[in-house]
From Swiss-Prot:
Similarity-based family: Belongs to the bacterial ribosomal protein bS18 family.
Disordered as annotated region, ranges: 1-21
Taxonomy, superkingdom: Bacteria
Organism lineage: Bacteria, Pseudomonadati, Chlamydiota, Chlamydiia, Chlamydiales
Keyword set, alphabetical order: Ribonucleoprotein, Ribosomal protein, RNA-binding, rRNA-binding
GO molecular function: small ribosomal subunit rRNA binding; structural constituent of ribosome
GO biological process: translation
Record's function text: Binds as a heterodimer with protein bS6 to the central domain of the 16S rRNA, where it helps stabilize the platform of the 30S subunit.
GO CC, one annotated term: cytosolic small ribosomal subunit
Subunit note: Part of the 30S ribosomal subunit. Forms a tight heterodimer with protein bS6.
Protein name: Small ribosomal subunit protein bS18
Length: 87
């Protein structure tokens, strides 16, 4: 049987990213829920185009990501936040 010849290592350490343990800002602050009327807090978790930032970027826990998403959607429907970002 012919075995393939590999000149490169299987795991290339140059392209690995360092992982940082991000703490959920809501858990560390002791929040129980997120209010949809608190637009200043909600704007921190929305991109310039109006998209909700993912957990891997914000560091929000799974529980609070769901609560945060629901609060942002409620604020959008009531009119506190825009659906589309500002140009």
């Amino acid at each position: 049987m012919n075995k393939p010849v590999h000149n490169k290592p299987v795991h290339n350490n140059e392209h690995r990213r360092k992982r940082f343990n991000k703490k959920c800002p809501f858990v560390s602050a002791g929040w129980k829920t997120i209010d949809y009327k608190d637009t200043e807090t909600l704007k921190k978790f929305i991109t310039e185009k109006g998209k909700i930032l993912p957990r891997r970027i914000t560091g929000v826990s799974s529980r609070f990501q769901g609560i945060l998403t629901l609060a942002i959607k409620r604020a959008r429907h009531i009119g506190f936040l825009p659906f589309v970002g500002e140009d």
